[in-house]
Swiss-Prot record:
Residues binding Zn(2+), per UniProt: 306, 308, 311, 337
Lineage of source species: Bacteria, Pseudomonadati, Pseudomonadota, Gammaproteobacteria, Pasteurellales
This protein's name: Queuine tRNA-ribosyltransferase
GO cellular component: cytosol
Species annotation: Histophilus somni (strain 129Pt) (Haemophilus somnus)
InterPro entries: ArchSynthase1/Queuine_TRR (IPR050076), TGT (IPR004803), TGT-like_sf (IPR036511), tRNA_ribo_trans-like (IPR002616)
Catalytic activity: 7-aminomethyl-7-carbaguanine + guanosine(34) in tRNA = 7-aminomethyl-7-carbaguanosine(34) in tRNA + guanine
């Protein structure tokens, strides 16, 4: 992977990630949003439909794909790209977040994490080395190191111990990644909870090890938005300018805008797809909750500013009807729209940065959705 930074506007950055794959060279324009394909699919969508929304890179889930279908099936197909028939770039998380979310079902040691398989109950073990091996078999274009996602709230002492162990695991991840001869990209993950001095130590340690990009982890886990914004504003200027920056698991449209304001290049979140299945649709002036009875006789399109397949062909009344009847098509049309909305938002952000008017765009964005602009 090669990252090229083309332009900055304030702290906002406009760049390109270039990937050489067997099918040719692929580019990902940044800032970028990655739809989430947890089990090797963006729920309810074919790869072609996802691509039409504007997506250039997807996120796959190492933990879930390891448990089911497993490494052997993946190897038999070639890799995750072949398995799901998406031949553009894929980023996979390390499995750490899912393991640590198991709570009492897991035990953390220096070697890794022992936990109970949520599918069949057997005891299994995941380590930095094992995570690198799984992601190698997945053929991930961007591999994430194995780390501990520090919970919130956390005491300073706990956050410090967690961050220090994550650094040791980062080094082990790097070493196993290199031993495997993996020629793809490996990203480090900055931890340290809401403590700036711990974040600084994490950054210094990761830069010393050396990675192709840097993610900001341990945010969007329950902390106040002000803390997330503060940590991003503190962390991003200390990261290498020539490497992409990735805010993990974020988020709402406003979170994407605020992340870009503070120097983030990449995002992922299940929100557009999960919310779509629950009738919660993102539009230019805010949100449409399509299950509301007021849409029963609404013959207008979902969003007059949107040119997605759903908005070009169907009315709110039809989407309301599909949802009420429990029709699968309703969830699919909603998903097409929400994914398109996110990709259109990122395209608007990129254009605003190119034209040196990103802050004007931010003001207009918040004005449309009826909210005030957060302070930096």
């Amino acid at each position: 992977m090669k990252f090229t930074l083309h332009k900055t506007n304030g702290m906002a950055r406009r760049g390109t990630m270039t990937f050489n794959r067997p099918q040719g060279e692929f580019t990902v324009e940044t800032p970028a949003f990655m739809p989430v394909g947890t089990y090797g699919t963006v729920k309810g969508m074919t790869p072609e439909e996802v691509r039409v929304t504007g997506a250039e890179i997807l996120l796959g889930n190492t933990f879930h794909l390891w448990l089911r279908p497993g490494q052997e099936i993946m190897r038999q197909h070639g890799d995750l790209h072949d398995f799901m028939q998406w031949h553009r770039p894929i980023l996979t998380d390390s499995g750490g977040f899912q393991v640590f979310s198991l709570g009492k079902l897991r035990k953390i040691t220096e070697e890794g994490v022992k936990f109970q398989n949520p599918i069949n109950g057997e005891r299994i073990f995941l380590s930095p080395e094992k995570s690198m091996e799984i992601q190698y078999d997945l053929g991930s274009d961007i591999v994430m190191i194995f780390d501990e996602c520090t919970p919130y709230p956390a005491t300073f002492d706990y956050a410090k111990k967690s961050m220090e162990m994550s650094l040791r695991w980062a080094k082990r991840s790097r070493e196993r990644f290199d031993e495997l001869g993996n020629k793809n990209a490996l990203f480090g993950i900055v931890q340290g909870s809401t403590f700036e001095d711990l974040r600084k130590l994490s950054i210094e340690g990761l830069i010393n090890i050396g990675f192709d990009g840097y993610a900001v982890g341990g945010l969007a886990v329950g902390e106040p938005k002000e803390d997330m914004h503060r940590i991003l504003a503190y962390v991003c200027p200390q990261l290498p300018a020539d490497k992409p920056r990735y805010l993990m698991g974020v988020g709402k449209p406003e979170d994407l805008v605020e992340g870009v304001r503070r120097g983030i290049d990449m995002f992922d979140c299940v929100m557009p797809t999960r919310n779509a299945r629950n009738g919660h649709l993102f539009v230019s002036n805010g949100i449409v909750k399509i299950r509301n009875a007021k849409y029963r006789n609404d013959t207008t399109s979902l969003d007059p500013e949107c040119d997605c397949y759903t908005c070009k062909h169907y009315t709110k009344a039809y989407l309301y009807h599909l949802d009420k009847c429990g029709e699968i098509l309703g969830a699919r049309l909603n998903t097409i729209h929400n994914l398109h909305y996110y990709q259109r938002l990122m395209a608007q952000i990129r254009q605003a940065i190119e034209e040196d008017r990103f802050e004007d765009f931010v003001v207009e964005f918040y004005k449309k959705i009826g909210k005030s602009v957060p302070t930096r």
